[in-house]
From Swiss-Prot:
GO MF, one annotated term: 2-phytyl-1,4-naphthoquinone methyltransferase activity
EC number per UniProt: 2.1.1.329
Keyword set includes Transmembrane helix: no
Protein name according to UniProt: 2-phytyl-1,4-naphtoquinone methyltransferase
Entries under Pfam families matching the protein: Ubie_methyltran
Length: 229
């Protein structure tokens, strides 16, 4: 299953940012900035961005921690990491980011290494959510926070119906035009499988986080899980 998901993200790498704009109605940048603020990341911190994709959150984190800080961007898609590296190289001054090809279920970092962490639109695609949160807990320093942002199924039936219509009538046809229809058709079933906010909180507490709160965003079509070690 992991290899199948990795292959999907390798194929969509060239249009990943464009499709994120469509999926979020252009709002993902606002939500990412909000997630970073929730982590409490500050200048000089060592931070982690899991499932970093094309590097958007990692670059934002790097601006937050500044030249005295350090960010590690982790993804299992080599193609997306290459896109992230190219984006970083076009920045001035050069951000202090290490790009790491790795699986979030087995992070290549020491215990208690990071001051803050983010994950944007990645948890829903992880094959073992408890294991990924357990690994995140391991590498965070005591009292460190993480913010995990992702799409969700809203509880309200009207918004749920709108979300499904938008996916079926807007996102998938646009993905089809870009040659990645099959890759983006997986989103709807992935939303159906994804634990709701309350369940995410329960999982986070069970693996050892001292506090966990889930905030619905965009009428429940999005959410952010804030967890503290």
């Amino acid at each position: 299953m992991t290899n199948k998901i990795r292959a999907i993200f390798d194929r969509i790498a060239p249009v990943y940012d464009q499709l994120n704009d469509w999926l979020s109605l252009g709002q993902h940048r606002i939500w990412k900035e909000m997630a970073i603020k929730w982590t409490g990341a500050k200048p000089g911190d060592t931070c982690l961005d899991l499932c970093c994709g094309s590097g958007d959150l990692a670059l934002r984190l790097a601006r937050r921690v500044g030249s005295t800080g350090q960010v590690s961007g982790v993804d299992f898609s080599a193609n997306l990491l290459e896109t992230a590296k190219q984006r970083a190289q076009s920045q001035y001054p050069q951000p202090n980011i290490s790009w790491v090809e790795a699986n979030v279920l087995d992070l290549p970092f020491k215990d208690n290494q990071f001051d803050a962490a983010t994950m944007g639109y990645g948890l829903r695609n992880v094959t073992d959510i408890p294991r990924s949160l357990q690994e995140l807990h391991r590498v965070l320093k005591p009292n460190a926070k993480a913010a995990i942002l992702d799409f969700h199924r809203p509880n309200n039936q009207q918004f749920r119906t709108f979300q499904q219509w938008y996916l079926d009538s807007i996102v998938v046809p646009l993905a089809d035009r870009l040659g990645v229809k099959e890759e983006y058709a997986y989103i709807s079933p992935s939303l159906d499988r994804f634990p709701i906010g309350k369940e995410q909180v329960e999982i986070a507490l069970k693996v050892g986080f001292t506090s966990a709160t889930h905030y619905p965003i965009a009428n429940g079509m999005m959410g952010v899980l804030i967890i503290s070690k």
